[in-house]
């Protein structure tokens, strides 16, 4: 079917789509076969009614089928957030990814330029000197040689160009804010996945279970799409096919609580400078929150069993210079394209 109208009529009447229907509908959207009015109406009908797990699974299945893939080790991990929390924090997941890479776990980092903040992962890494405009072969080399590679979302999801203008005109969150982090081009099966609202914790854990992920922690920390050190982080953890919910506090990581202003960032250049300060030995709230996210990621990866062991390994990665070395290698390999 190449006509969106039947699916549009169904969601407009507040009926949920089946997985197959969602897969077909998003194939129409992402193949350029729907008009801007149809795209806008469809996305907002889903948003107002509330997207179901089956609809997200179907949409992700289509998005994954159209993406440019990257070869990565089977044990690679991603640390990613949905964005959209409007917090303007430092690039926490970026530094956490480098720390995890320095600890010897391969990271296939998926990200984009800023949407609701001043600096997304792509902005931050570009300012650090990483060449983000590279193809799958170079990214695979980065992961092999630096233990971390960056996949710039817009280069891997070209089908998104068909819905981009409508999303901009709508100016509000849609299901596509969720789909990107669920569509890692390296096909990772282990993730630390931050979400902008706690309402999505369990549903997205269910989505990742149904899509075959091995271990995923879906987290929301005190308004942030990250693990936070400002207060309580809520977690829905998918492990061995089962989902359990729990909370984490700064004390669980052995760090002092901070306030949001302590981890507020700026643009890509300012955040790159802040990241370099932490690599240089600065002991501050940015270091603490990044270590916390890295520690959880090391648990998810299977490298360690406990958060406290994760904190020790993450701190060693940072303090030994292994994190800085991972960044240096990433910069070198990503720019070695002759």
From Swiss-Prot:
Catalyzes the transfer of the phosphoribosyl group of 5-phosphorylribose-1-pyrophosphate (PRPP) to anthranilate to yield N-(5'-phosphoribosyl)-anthranilate (PRA). This is Anthranilate phosphoribosyltransferase. Belongs to the anthranilate phosphoribosyltransferase family. Mg(2+) 1 binds at residues 93, 226. PANTHER family: ANTHRANILATE PHOSPHORIBOSYLTRANSFERASE. The gene is trpD. Anthranilate 1 binds at residues 81, 112. Binds 2 magnesium ions per monomer. Its EC number is 2.4.2.18. Pathway: Amino-acid biosynthesis; L-tryptophan biosynthesis; L-tryptophan from chorismate: step 2/5. The keyword Glycosyltransferase applies. Homodimer. HAMAP family: TrpD (MF_00211). It catalyses: N-(5-phospho-beta-D-ribosyl)anthranilate + diphosphate = 5-phospho-alpha-D-ribose 1-diphosphate + anthranilate. GO terms for cellular component: cytosol. GO terms for biological process: L-tryptophan biosynthetic process.
């Amino acid at each position: 079917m190449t006509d969106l109208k039947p699916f549009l009529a169904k969601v407009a009447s507040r009926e949920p789509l089946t997985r197959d229907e969602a897969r077909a509908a998003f194939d129409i959207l992402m193949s350029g076969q729907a008009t801007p009015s149809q795209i806008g109406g469809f996305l907002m009908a889903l948003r107002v009614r509330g997207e179901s797990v089956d609809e997200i699974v179907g949409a992700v299945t289509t998005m994954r089928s159209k993406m440019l893939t990257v070869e990565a080790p089977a044990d690679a991990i991603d640390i990613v957030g949905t964005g959209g929390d409007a917090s303007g924090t430092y690039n926490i997941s970026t530094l956490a990814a480098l720390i995890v890479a320095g600890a010897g776990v391969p990271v296939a980092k998926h990200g984009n330029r800023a949407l609701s903040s001043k600096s997304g992962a792509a902005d931050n890494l570009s300012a650090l000197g990483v060449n983000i405009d590279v193809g799958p072969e170079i990214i695979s080399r980065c992961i092999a040689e630096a233990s971390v590679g960056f996949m710039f979302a817009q280069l891997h999801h070209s089908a998104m160009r068909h819905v981009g203008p409508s999303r901009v005109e709508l100016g509000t969150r849609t299901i596509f804010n969720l789909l990107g982090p669920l569509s890692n081009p390296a096909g990772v099966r282990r993730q630390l996945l931050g979400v902008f609202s706690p309402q999505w914790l369990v549903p997205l854990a269910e989505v990742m279970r149904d899509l075959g992920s091995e271990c995923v922690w879906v987290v929301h920390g005190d308004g942030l799409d990250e693990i936070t050190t400002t207060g309580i982080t809520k977690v829905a953890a998918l492990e061995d096919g089962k989902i359990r919910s729990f909370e984490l506090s700064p004390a669980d990581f052995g760090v002092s609580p901070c306030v949001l202003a302590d981890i507020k960032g700026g643009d890509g250049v300012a955040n790159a400078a802040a990241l370099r300060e932490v690599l240089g030995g600065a002991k501050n709230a940015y270091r603490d929150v990044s270590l916390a996210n890295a520690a959880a990621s090391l648990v998810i990866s299977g490298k360690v069993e406990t958060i406290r062991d994760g904190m020790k390994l993450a701190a060693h990665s940072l303090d030994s210079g292994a994190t800085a070395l991972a960044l240096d290698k990433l910069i070198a390999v990503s720019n070695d394209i002759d």
